[in-house]
Amino acid sequence: MDLRTFIRDIPDFPEKGIIFRDITPLLKDKEAFKHAIDMLAEKLSEIDFDLIVAPEARGFIFGGALSYKLNKGFIPVRKPGKLPYEVISEKYTLEYGEAELQMHVDSINKGQKVIIFDDVLATGGTAKALKKLVEKAGGEVVAMSFLIELSYLNPRDILKDENIISLIIL
């Protein structure tokens, strides 16, 4: 199944000059969604790890499903003000602005092995910030996984030493 056919391009969203990769057609199609989860789980099952860390919102969809399928813990990473307990934070630059990520201070035990999952790898800024957040908490990032990688933005340039696993490369 060619999952690329389920990715819709939305020009000038959220800002002019940005092409948004809309995964809702993939999510809507039960066979495509299942295929994506199964393929990602197959790739990740070969790695020794304890937790999947994923940012809101679309990272939750895949990160939660993968955690369930692989019998691993799931750590949600949110925007400021969304978590009820004490947090650690990391600020970073996006393709179209600045942002901040937070997770509970006790989310990761020292030495736990983590896979970071997000729906799209664009510039690598979010992934880099997620890694810093995991390391602040005492975790070790053993891989970064993505549904879609936008190779034309050269995200691997800033993630040179990372084990990157992408399902769809555009």
Curated annotation (Swiss-Prot):
Q: Name one GO biological process term.
A: adenine salvage
Keywords (alphabetical) are: Cytoplasm, Glycosyltransferase, Purine salvage, Transferase
GO CC entries: cytoplasm
The principal location of this protein is cytoplasm
**The keyword rRNA-binding appears for this protein:** no
Check the record and name the Gene3D superfamilies matching this protein. 3.40.50.2020
GO MF annotation list: adenine binding; adenine phosphoribosyltransferase activity; AMP binding
Organism domain of life: Bacteria
Q: Where in the cell is it found?
A: Cytoplasm
The SS bond pairs are none
Keyword Cytoplasm listed: yes
What EC number(s) would the UniProt record show?
A: 2.4.2.7
Task: Write out the pathway annotation from the protein's UniProt entry.
Answer: Purine metabolism; AMP biosynthesis via salvage pathway; AMP from adenine: step 1/1
Query: Catalyses which reaction?
Result: AMP + diphosphate = 5-phospho-alpha-D-ribose 1-diphosphate + adenine
Q: Which SUPFAM superfamilies match?
A: PRTase-like
Q: Cite the InterPro entries for this sequence.
A: Ade_phspho_trans (IPR005764), PRibTrfase_dom (IPR000836), PRTase-like (IPR029057), UPRTase/APRTase (IPR050054)
Family classification: Belongs to the purine/pyrimidine phosphoribosyltransferase family.
The annotated subunit structure for this chain is:
Homodimer.
What does this gene product do? Catalyzes a salvage reaction resulting in the formation of AMP, that is energically less costly than de novo synthesis.
Write the protein's name.
Answer: Adenine phosphoribosyltransferase
Write down the species.
Thermosipho africanus (strain TCF52B)
Please name the gene that encodes this protein: apt
